[in-house]
């Protein structure tokens, strides 16, 4: 018996054309091209989900370092002082404090100075 695959092919084509929606020209109109760019976009998305974690950590460290230096401390001394003082705030929270709650961050810096000195 002959197997007709039109329905499956149509569904597959629609899936990739839907994923490629928003691209310009052939990238959103032709199945083969749309499939290539859609698959590539999935590769980028997978890779960048991993990179986002690294980039956010870098950003947090940068913000903490800037705020610590405003208070006369380097990043490494500040983080070491927090460990010695028994403060268990992660970098995400510290970076948020550095940006939004400068007074609280300044108090932490004073605590670190007293513990390190």
Curated annotation (Swiss-Prot):
Domain of life: Bacteria
Key words of the record: Ribonucleoprotein, Ribosomal protein, RNA-binding, rRNA-binding
InterPro entries membership: Ribosomal_bL20, RIBOSOMAL_L20_CS, Ribosomal_protein_bL20_C
Keyword Transcription regulation belongs to the record: no
Alphabetical GO biological process terms: ribosomal large subunit assembly; translation
CDD domains hit by this protein: Ribosomal_L20
Molecular functions per Gene Ontology: rRNA binding; structural constituent of ribosome
Cellular component GO terms held in the UniProt record: ribonucleoprotein complex; ribosome
HAMAP family: Ribosomal_bL20
PANTHER family assigned to the protein according to its UniProt record, in alphabetical order: 39S RIBOSOMAL PROTEIN L20 (PTHR10986)
Known role: Binds directly to 23S ribosomal RNA and is necessary for the in vitro assembly process of the 50S ribosomal subunit. It is not involved in the protein synthesizing functions of that subunit.
Family, similarity comment: Belongs to the bacterial ribosomal protein bL20 family.
Protein name: Large ribosomal subunit protein bL20
Organism: Solidesulfovibrio magneticus (strain ATCC 700980 / DSM 13731 / RS-1) (Desulfovibrio magneticus)
Recorded name of the encoding gene: rplT
